[in-house]
A protein has these predicted regions:
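N-terminal intrinsically disordered, cationic/polar leader segments
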Residues: 2-65, 69-145, 149-179
């Protein structure tokens, strides 16, 4: 029995949930999200709650039960409050700027990196912090990981892009040979 899966998901007043078989459409103040769930999971709307149940007791159905409930909960949270991932850049001459749907990064390469933000994702730059906002948790995390991959932090000086919650384990440099 899934501890996570059996918890019902409360639907706030501003959120509208439509269920059509395995396709669930969630609409709220921050946008609209659609997701197709696994066929072994049954999703039902009861009053101001959404309940997720397995179709049968197979291993696949039980494993998808908790996943479906978590994804659905993230959809409701995303359309009400949204999600944010913050990246911090550290290095001499490193800069970032947002113009429309493009994120321009100067990360010590011979050329600036132009990253086109996907639909539904916004970026804000404050000094040396890039904030990525969106209603889809998976997409926000994916975009943050892609941006971080342009210049991952190195362990000697800590230069590069890192999540603000991430700690980089620093290494000691080489010590000169003694004569």
């Amino acid at each position: 029995m899934s501890r996570i899966g059996k918890k019902p998901i409360g639907i706030p007043d501003k959120v509208e949930v439509k269920i059509n078989g395995t396709v669930v459409d969630v609409k709220g103040p921050k946008g609209q999200l659609t997701y197709t769930f696994h066929k072994d999971v049954k999703i039902e709307k009861k009053d101001k709650e959404v309940v997720v149940n397995p179709v049968n007791q197979s291993a696949t159905a039980r494993s998808q039960w908790g996943v479906a409930r978590t994804v659905l909960g993230n959809m409701v949270t995303g359309v009400t409050t949204g999600f944010v991932k913050s990246l911090e850049f550290n290095g001499v001459g490193y800069k970032a700027a947002v113009s429309g749907a493009n994120l321009t990064l100067n990360l010590g390469y011979s050329h600036p990196i132009e990253y086109k933000l996907p639909k539904g994702i916004e970026a804000k730059v404050n000094k040396n912090v890039i904030e990525i906002h969106g209603s889809d948790k998976e997409l926000v995390g994916f975009v943050a990981a892609q941006v971080r991959s342009f210049r991952e932090p190195e362990p000697y000086k800590g230069k590069g892009l890192k999540y603000t919650t991430e700690t980089i384990i620093r290494k000691a440099g080489k010590t000169g040979a003694k004569k």
